Amino acid sequence: MGSRLTQDEFHPFIEALLPHVRAFAYTWFNLQARKRKYFKKHEKRMSKDEERAVKDELLGEKAEVKQKWASRLLAKLRKDIRPECREDFVLAITGKKAPGCVLSNPDQKGKMRRIDCLRQADKVWRLDLVMVILFKGIPLESTDGERLVKAAQCGHPVLCVQPHHIGVAVKELDLYLAYFVRERGEAGRARGRGSDGREGMRRASQSGRPGESGPAGLRDQAGTRSLGWAG
């Protein structure tokens, strides 16, 4: 069993994709698990200080531990991607080929499969959600599946897990929060502007990257870094 897992972890598919996994992903998945565990034990949410302490602990984890986690998760994803799509997926992520649809194996109802992303996990995540977190560094909850939007060129929106075909719908509240946080830092210049926040919301929407929600960038700037495993 151990030797098989080791071989899986060093599969060419995994070796090619590993440098493109966002460093943020390890912290995000583990932080969500810690928060759920804390809530079940204490019947209350973590305070901001407690959450920050856990986040700092996870950020300081050894690179070898993060690499082991990413390798195991990529091994799971490989098995859930249809064999005929695996090579094209690697070529698209590594920038060697234009991204096309990458079909996943459906569940028993013909819908998107869900997987656990941690050992002994109490939560399963949709494959397309996992792909967006891993390769685009967008912090999404396991319940955010309805916020994912497939691109117009995606020919198989039900089963496609190509991250380049997946965007995130921006909610009005997201835009307002992005505007509010930004305006607090620019309080002086913000005086005299309308109180309804519509102009700020418009600017927040225009300044964000396509397909990403406002809070995605606000929650963790580490989402823009990749796991190069070189520090």
From Swiss-Prot:
Recognizes and binds the palindromic sequence 5'-TTGGCNNNNNGCCAA-3' present in viral and cellular promoters and in the origin of replication of adenovirus type 2. These proteins are individually capable of activating transcription and replication. The gene is NFI. Residues 1-192 bind DNA. One of its GO terms (molecular function) is RNA polymerase II cis-regulatory region sequence-specific DNA binding. It is found in: Nucleus. Residues 188-202 have a biased composition (Basic and acidic residues). PANTHER family: NUCLEAR FACTOR 1 C-TYPE (PTHR11492:SF2), NUCLEAR FACTOR I (PTHR11492). This is Nuclear factor 1. Residues 188-231 are annotated as: Disordered. Keywords: Activator, DNA replication, DNA-binding, Nucleus, Transcription, Transcription regulation. Binds DNA as a homodimer. Belongs to the CTF/NF-I family. GO terms for biological process: DNA replication; positive regulation of DNA-templated transcription; regulation of transcription by RNA polymerase II. The keyword Plastid does not apply. It comes from Sus scrofa (Pig). GO terms for cellular component: nucleus. Its main location: nucleus.
